[in-house]
């Protein structure tokens, strides 16, 4: 059962001083060790003795000469050791840590599929094997994600990787009810959010908790249309917690451990892009995690670093003090800059560039998208309770997401970004009339909150990420900025309200109670600035009108 007490320094805001050594958190335990370059060197997919079907899928995705990323090398090497294959279920406890866009999803999916295939009992079991199999689902592995969007993307990718291996994969976020749908009996891999797994395990919230959740989210995206208790944890061999720094963070911590408590005994893999002090402390002091052997840490040499080709552009506030107007102006300048570069490089026939704008609240998403609308910049506003957030599918969001596929299996074209009959206009002109949106088929600007900053792999056409307000700390900055410049591609992150030294703009200084800024110091800096320079690569400061001030 989950412990009753929250461990000390469980979250970042409890007043406990965070000590960093070589960019890694050292409180309250000695600093963890990053792998060296030799340990994490690129290797071919044939080097590890992986299942033949998995190697075939990897080569189909990344080419016959494709090689592993550092975290993939570390993970594949560890999980294919002979003693790992023969180890009893429940003995494997591994923490995978790597920078954004570095192949973390592959680093846990491939070893998971490799072991599931090696121990595959054969075709899906029948009711003669499980007395209640006609009514319940018995997964062999569970993958937990923080959002339905990430669950759907991971499900799609998992099905691609298992195309030549014939393992069964089921994603709960791809069903209208957010449950197991018609699936019964056995399934090799079950993917879902913590909330979905709680419901399917038959765990319920109190009426007070449910009312609070409804109030926070505005509405329930997933109605209780499917009976609870449809999943049994008795056959689970592996559990993966994707985005572990989120699911073991303050908001999801108790729910995540309550899901883990439904599994009798299973190997556990944690995957994360950041390693904050509270996560280290949780794994080394919490009774739920310390009752077994300590976690093995497989950490990429690039952990806590931004993508190497990512340019950070700090925008000085304009004299008008209209930050949202500055954002709209920078959107136009950025799209024009991308179009000019595409023409110069002969890429005019490629998919036009796109921008993702991160805000700190649903209200700010509404404000920014409204200003963009008045400037005739069409955008997709995406929030937890937004009208375009659909059950069972990503809908308009697919325009901005990566669409992987095997050769000869082209993915379907994304749905049109606007469906005039259903989509509510997000702005009106000065006369109170609504522009005709029926002619718009693709939007190039996405405005959202941190809902989409964790784990999602955006399409290569997403060239830029805008941060309208400073994130609460450097780790949040890494998550949001890392949505661009992924997989070795060039990109930029455009930051408003704070410069590279952590100094806030005048408007932000006057708003000392603003969310997401971190503690304001006497010199006008936030805690973010203390370590921001450690993660930045190429950077520049630009005036509100687009003139470069310095690099």
From Swiss-Prot:
Localization: Mitochondrion
Keywords annotated in UniProt: ATP-binding, Helicase, Hydrolase, Mitochondrion, Nucleotide-binding, RNA-binding, Transit peptide
Keyword set includes Hydrolase: yes
Locus of motif Q motif: 43-73
Domain Helicase ATP-binding residues, every copy: 85-293
Record's GO cellular component terms: mitochondrion
GO MF terms, alphabetically ordered: ATP binding; ATP hydrolysis activity; RNA binding; RNA helicase activity
Principal localisation: mitochondrion
EC supergroup of this enzyme: hydrolase
Reaction(s) catalysed (UniProt annotation): ATP + H2O = ADP + phosphate + H(+)
Region (Disordered): 504-527
Entry binding sites for ATP: 98-105
Key word Metal-binding present: no
EC number: 3.6.4.13
Pfam families: DEAD, Helicase_C
Highest taxon in the source lineage: Eukaryota
Motif mapping: DEAD box: 242-245
InterPro entries for the chain: DEAD/DEAH_box_helicase_dom (IPR011545), Helicase_ATP-bd (IPR014001), Helicase_C-like (IPR001650), P-loop_NTPase (IPR027417)
Extent of the transit peptide: 1-13
Domain Helicase C-terminal positions: 334-551
Record's function text: ATP-binding RNA helicase involved in mitochondrial RNA metabolism. Required for maintenance of mitochondrial DNA.
Record comment regarding domains: The Q motif is unique to and characteristic of the DEAD box family of RNA helicases and controls ATP binding and hydrolysis.
Similarity section: Belongs to the DEAD box helicase family. MRH4 subfamily.
Protein name stated in the entry: ATP-dependent RNA helicase MRH4, mitochondrial
Organism field: Cryptococcus neoformans var. neoformans serotype D (strain B-3501A) (Filobasidiella neoformans)
